[in-house]
């Protein structure tokens, strides 16, 4: 009987080593497959709009149309939409045909409560600890340490687009703390 000599070119892989490699590959594939939705959940989707903007959404998750948004609103009205990072954001009506060029993030800078607009007093009043903000979102009474964050509000194809505000805060003259 002839002896088969091993060549130096062919690696010697035993049955145990092959099964270990196969098991490792299978477990790795399953783990990566299970990890994909978790990673996708924490990375926000890139939305439409110029300059990295996000299309404003209504309470049902539908895009907000400017013409429908302005139908039943008057100058000075503020209405909540879902804005950047999913945060509630106030859109301010300028007149029957236009909105202001900024939106106001409705998250209180004290403890993160949603701050409602008080029409009677013409200011935002936090229900959690009494912080107050003027009509532009500038803090006028604590304990909130900072003004409400701003976002640019524009329209593209009748859709309201919100984009990050990175310029000087027009209310305080300071660099934006949220950028």
From Swiss-Prot:
Report one GO cellular component: plasma membrane-derived thylakoid membrane
Subcellular localization, per the record?
Cellular thylakoid membrane
The free-text note explaining how the cofactor binds reads: Binds 1 [2Fe-2S] cluster per subunit.
Per its record, the protein catalyses: 2 oxidized [plastocyanin] + a plastoquinol + 2 H(+)(in) = 2 reduced [plastocyanin] + a plastoquinone + 4 H(+)(out)
In the UniProt record, does the keyword Metal-binding occur? yes
- Enzyme class (EC, first level): translocase
User: Could you say which cofactors this protein requires?
Assistant: [2Fe-2S] cluster
Topological relation to the membrane, as annotated: Single-pass membrane protein
- Residues crossing the lipid bilayer are 21-43
Disulfide-bonded cysteines: 113-128
Q: Mind telling me which CDD domains this protein's record contains?
A: Rieske_cytochrome_b6f
Q: Does the keyword Transport apply?
A: yes
**One Pfam assignment:** TM_PetC
Instruction: Give the molecular function GO annotations.
Output: 2 iron, 2 sulfur cluster binding; electron transporter, transferring electrons within cytochrome b6/f complex of photosystem II activity; metal ion binding; monooxygenase activity; oxidoreductase activity, acting on paired donors, with incorporation or reduction of molecular oxygen; plastoquinol--plastocyanin reductase activity
Its chief place of residence is membrane
Q: Which InterPro entries match?
A: Cyt_b6_f_Rieske, Rieske_2Fe-2S, Rieske_2Fe-2S_sf, Rieske_Fe-S_prot, Rieske_Fe-S_prot_C
Q: Sorted alphabetically, which keywords does the UniProt record give?
A: 2Fe-2S, Disulfide bond, Electron transport, Iron, Iron-sulfur, Membrane, Metal-binding, Thylakoid, Translocase, Transmembrane, Transmembrane helix, Transport
Name all Rieske domain ranges: 61-162
* Subunit structure, interactors included: The 4 large subunits of the cytochrome b6-f complex are cytochrome b6, subunit IV (17 kDa polypeptide, PetD), cytochrome f and the Rieske protein, while the 4 small subunits are PetG, PetL, PetM and PetN. The complex functions as a dimer.
Miscellaneous section = The Rieske iron-sulfur protein is a high potential 2Fe-2S protein.
Protein family according to the UniProt entry = Belongs to the Rieske iron-sulfur protein family.
Protein's name according to its UniProt entry: Cytochrome b6-f complex iron-sulfur subunit
Its source organism is: Desmonostoc sp. (strain PCC 7906) (Nostoc sp. (strain PCC 7906))
Provide the organism lineage as a comma list.
Answer: Bacteria, Bacillati, Cyanobacteriota, Cyanophyceae, Nostocales
């Amino acid at each position: 009987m002839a002896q088969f000599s091993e060549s130096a070119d062919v690696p010697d892989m035993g049955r145990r080593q092959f099964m270990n490699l196969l098991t490792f590959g299978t477990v790795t594939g399953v783990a990566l497959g299970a990890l994909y939705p978790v990673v996708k959940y924490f990375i926000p989707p890139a939305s439409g709009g110029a300059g990295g903007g996000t299309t404003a959404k209504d309470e049902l998750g539908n895009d907000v149309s400017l013409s429908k948004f302005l139908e039943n609103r008057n100058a000075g009205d503020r209405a909540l939409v879902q804005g950047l990072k999913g945060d509630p954001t106030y859109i301010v009506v300028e007149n029957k045909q236009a909105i202001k060029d900024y939106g106001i993030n409705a998250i209180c800078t004290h403890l993160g409560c949603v701050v409602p607009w008080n029409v009677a007093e013409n200011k935002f009043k936090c229900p959690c600890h009494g912080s107050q903000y003027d009509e532009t979102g500038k803090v006028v009474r604590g304990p909130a340490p900072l003004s409400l964050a701003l976002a640019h509000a524009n329209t593209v194809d009748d859709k309201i687009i919100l984009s990050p505000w990175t310029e000087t805060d027009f209310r305080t003259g300071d660099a934006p703390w949220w950028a």
